[in-house]
Design a protein with these regions (language model features):
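Alpha/beta-hydrolase superfamily serine-hydrolase fold, recognizing
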Residues: 1-271
Length: 271
């Protein structure tokens, strides 16, 4: 698909003829800390296959990714070069703008979803479309996303879930800040509501399902975002997949993958 920054690779998944016809066209964004991931990873391909098998047409998006970053070293000061915000959000916005017409013509309702960094891009692109008066998704499906420039404090319950050996592979607040700064490219962009919608005015956002991992420090952002959505009058459902860790949709065959997909399927046909 043509976008303002060039071609945007897409992959389409069509349900089998025998599958029940869905009223939703799902656009799905993989994660990867804004810097990694592709259309072949299970978090893209596996999720799309599972949803298509349930009768939903799915489009996965290979949005432009920012350069790799270090978990330990702070980004250099100043403006970072290369692909940075808003380019990935622009790609998502361009895809949604073009697919909205296709969805309407085929009688489908557009659902935008994503996992981890992809969830942030989905939320940011939707908020921008609403504020700019452009076509936006009718519903949002967000899995273990990070929506805040600075990771919110974890609840006592979450802290207990990521204690001890469960804390070894967690995203620390400083790590999240490095990841987000690398994506933002400029200090000023860290406060941009379309880069990190958490903590900003979310009134008018569409009905949203948030799926979070149980033992995942990033759940603090998902839980806060769900509360912020509800406080602004948005119909937001939040569910924690018991026993799961970050990235469970990238691991087909695990019980958490199956539960996450099952929750998404039920929600998609609930309205």
């Amino acid at each position: 698909m043509a976008g303002r920054h060039g071609r945007i690779p897409l992959r389409r998944y069509r349900p089998r003829a025998a599958a029940p016809r869905s009223s939703s066209l799902i656009v799905w964004l993989h994660g990867g800390a804004f810097s990694h991931g592709d259309l072949d990873m299970p978090e893209a391909h596996g999720v799309a296959l599972a949803l298509a098998e349930a009768g939903h047409p799915v489009v996965t998006v290979d949005y432009r990714r920012v350069p790799s970053w270090s978990w330990w070293a702070r980004p250099r000061p100043g403006v970072l070069g290369g692909v940075r915000y808003p380019v990935p959000v622009d790609d998502v916005s361009d895809v949604i703008g073009q697919l909205a017409g296709e969805a309407a013509a085929s009688g489908h309702s557009l659902v935008l979803g994503g996992a981890s960094a992809g969830a942030c891009l989905a939320a940011g692109a939707t908020l921008r479309a609403l504020r700019e008066g452009r076509a936006a998704s009718r519903r949002l499906l967000l899995a273990y996303g990070t929506f805040h420039a600075v990771l919110p404090p974890a609840s006592p319950e979450l802290r207990a879930r990521i204690r001890g050996r469960h804390g070894l592979a967690q995203f620390r607040p400083a790590t999240v800040e490095r990841m987000n700064r690398n994506y933002a490219g400029r200090i000023e962009a860290m406060a941009d509501p379309f880069a990190f919608p958490g903590g900003h005015d979310l009134a008018g956002m569409p009905q949203t399902l948030l799926l979070d991992a149980d033992r995942d420090s990033l759940r603090a952002s998902g839980e806060h975002f769900a509360r912020e959505l509800r406080a602004d009058g948005v119909d937001a459902t939040h569910h924690v997949v018991a026993g799961s860790t970050h990235g469970f949709l990238n691991r087909p065959g695990e019980p958490a993958f199956d539960e996450g997909i099952a929750r998404a399927k039920r929600w998609l046909v609930s309205a």
